[in-house]
Amino acid sequence: MTRPAVSYDELDEYLRGDGHNDYVGVSAIDGLIAAVVAGPVTILPDIWLPHVFGGSMPQARPGSIEERLVNTVLNRHDEVESLLRDAPGHYYPIFMNHKGKTIVGPWAIGFSLGLSLGGEAWAPIAGNAKASDLPHHGRQSAAGQTAHPAFSSGAAEIESNRSSSHHIRSPAVARHHKTGPITTQPPAQTQPYRKTACSLRLQCTRSVEHDTQARGGPCIPGVSGLKLGLRPADRWSGCRWEHVVAYLGSPLYESTSTCAEGADRQLLVLRED
């Protein structure tokens, strides 16, 4: 049963608060959820959900707006889990749209946080990379969990992260709070481009069978390949995702991919020239 909730735009407005650039928006939350659901290990809400609300859970009294905000995030988690399990071809990330341009950066930042929460379990997916090579951005909490700078940071730490190419830039970066309505529809095809080098590359040697995209048209491939690719007896085989990447660095990476039937599936793709 769906919990009482608010719309995604309402959630984004509440999270925006006073408009500071370090707020976490719905698109970043959706990236976090995607990594949590698609990851090789179970990560309980008690671990990942506080990252959405600045490191601690709000006082969600029954019937309160805080309860509905939490419910909205949990409902999206359940929806993504259901889609990636039962209908991965129908999963679409929640990206932001600004003046007709699809902005993927905040989603990738959230996805990168999800990677860091998975820790050692992501090492097999990273090919020959050691688990220590995967990004663990931010500070360590008392419980040993990484507190992601984009989700819960003071002003000094945000500025420190922003000035270093080895950390993920604050998700707003003068643009996050100016974005328009949230969309979950596949965006129109655009030409991907790269502005800075990428610090993280996950090599995956599996992709979807051709029939999963037989309906045609532009699409954003589901990140479920990261999860289902670990199962030896499933229907994911054959092709490959070349570079599945959570974008690190500055400025925001803006791109979409269009998948033709039978083509390699690519999500947040950066290529080395």
UniProtKB/Swiss-Prot annotation:
Question: Out of the domains of life, which is the source?
Answer: Bacteria
Where is this chain's protein located in or outside the cell?
A: Cell membrane
**TM segments?**
24-44, 103-123
Protein keywords: Cell membrane, Membrane, Plasmid, Transmembrane, Transmembrane helix
For bias kind Basic residues, which ranges apply?
A: 164-179
InterPro entries recorded:
YgfB-like, YgfB-like_sf
Cellular component terms per the entry's GO annotation: plasma membrane
Q: What is this protein called?
A: Uncharacterized protein y4jE
- In its UniProt entry, the species of origin is given as Sinorhizobium fredii (strain NBRC 101917 / NGR234)
